[in-house]
């Protein structure tokens, strides 16, 4: 058997062999798109997102359906509402602008946990509502009992019968305030906490309540289009 010269033997362990780095920049094939939320908010430009360049004619369609969330304090400039964030889904693209449609709302985890109190009763309810355009949203609300003046007991629990009455009020308020409204009006009511204030007002007639609010809104079925609730934002881009 002939002896091969040094360096001609096959590499036994290729894991430790360093790969040659190419000089190509990873961001050279990326495109930047601006994220734009609905026009009802004062600050409706919410940053940028990346997409890899493609040779396809409709390569921008890869962006459709991408979800992102924005804190309400960034949307309105008011830090007092920084405990709430809105979720948007990219539904239309005009040039380098991505128009986001409403896709849900949620409280921040620290705010949600801070509202739940020991020795109190937590009352929760959820109900599906149908918007004007046929979109279906599932609304989650909550409320916590409150000690009224002169209350001396350590615990502040509500009777089960009164809890059922308060939950019935929650269902009725969700139906009255949100059902049948267009999506923009729903977003305004969520931003102003109209539902939570109404629940606290009516429910306190049965038992004192506090921290009543819409905890979460989840999209079940969306029929939003560029002509429903978003035309103003698109016109602002094209003009």
UniProtKB/Swiss-Prot annotation:
GO terms for molecular function: structural constituent of ribosome. Pfam families: Ribosomal_S3Ae. One of its GO terms (cellular component) is cytosolic small ribosomal subunit. It is found in: Cytoplasm. Keywords: Cytoplasm, Ribonucleoprotein, Ribosomal protein. Transmembrane segments: none annotated. Residues 1-24 are annotated as: Disordered. One of its GO terms (biological process) is translation. Belongs to the eukaryotic ribosomal protein eS1 family. Component of the small ribosomal subunit. Mature ribosomes consist of a small (40S) and a large (60S) subunit. The 40S subunit contains about 33 different proteins and 1 molecule of RNA (18S). The 60S subunit contains about 49 different proteins and 3 molecules of RNA (25S, 5.8S and 5S). This is Small ribosomal subunit protein eS1. The gene is RPS1.
């Amino acid at each position: 058997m002939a002896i091969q010269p040094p360096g001609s033997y096959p590499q036994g362990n290729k894991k430790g062999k360093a790969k040659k780095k190419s000089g190509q920049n990873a961001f050279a094939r990326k495109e930047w798109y601006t994220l734009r939320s609905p026009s009802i908010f004062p600050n409706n430009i919410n940053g940028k997102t990346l997409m890899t360049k493609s040779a396809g004619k409709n390569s921008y369609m890869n962006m459709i359906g991408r979800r992102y969330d924005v804190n309400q304090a960034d949307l309105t400039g008011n830090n007092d509402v920084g405990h709430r964030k809105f979720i948007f889904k990219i539904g239309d693209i005009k040039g380098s602008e991505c128009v986001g449609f409403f896709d849900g709302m949620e409280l921040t985890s620290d705010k949600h946990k801070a509202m739940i109190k020991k020795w109190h009763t937590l009352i929760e309810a959820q109900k599906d509502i149908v918007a004007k355009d046929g979109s279906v949203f599932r609304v989650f609300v909550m409320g916590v009992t409150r000690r009224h003046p002169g209350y001396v007991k350590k615990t502040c629990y509500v009777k089960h019968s009164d809890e059922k009455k308060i939950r019935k009020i929650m269902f009725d308020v969700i139906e009255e305030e949100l059902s049948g409204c267009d999506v923009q009006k729903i977003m305004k009511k969520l931003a102003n906490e109209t539902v939570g204030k109404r629940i606290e007002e009516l429910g306190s007639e049965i038992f004192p309540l506090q921290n009543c609010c819409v905890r979460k809104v989840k999209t079940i079925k969306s029929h939003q289009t560029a002509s429903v609730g978003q035309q103003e934002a698109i016109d602002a881009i094209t003009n």
